[in-house]
Amino acid sequence: MTVEEVFAKIKAHQIEGTMFQDQMRQYFDFLNLKGFKRMHEHHYKEESDSLVKTDSFYMRHANSFIPEYSVSTQSYIPQNWRSYRRQDVDATTKRRAVKDAMAKWVEWERQTKDLYSTSYKELLNDNAIDFAEFVKENLVLDVSEELAFAESLYMELENCDYDMVYLAEIQPDYSKKFKK
């Protein structure tokens, strides 16, 4: 793959990442889990900042726009939820929804790490060292940290079987941790 193709794939994935984080923010807001909502709001902003940084780096080093690449508009919120009201969601359904959302988040971060790691290797193989270093320093290392955090939270929630009391109790901690 050329540098242009690698960065086109990265940018498309970053755009998809902002959409993913925004949907998770909406989902947790709907579920009235304000700490998790704020956490994904924070990740949305980080994704947006990363996209701008990637664009700026490419523009400075390649002196051109990143080529366009197909962007998926997949919905991560179940379609039938669009007709629900908050009051329609009982504790069992909410528990299942949180479990599903956390699994999707971990999977998203794994896919992102795989893409960025593969991109790094392809750029190195193409002798595009400065582009490879950017991907490593700004994308691979960042997503590695986010994946470790997501997996840790996922395991924590799995260990308590997504207990609703526990979920409610930790929301203020996440609100505080990810305060603007």
Regions found by a protein language model. Name each.
Residues 1-180:
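Iron-associated oxidoreductase/ferritin-like identity signal
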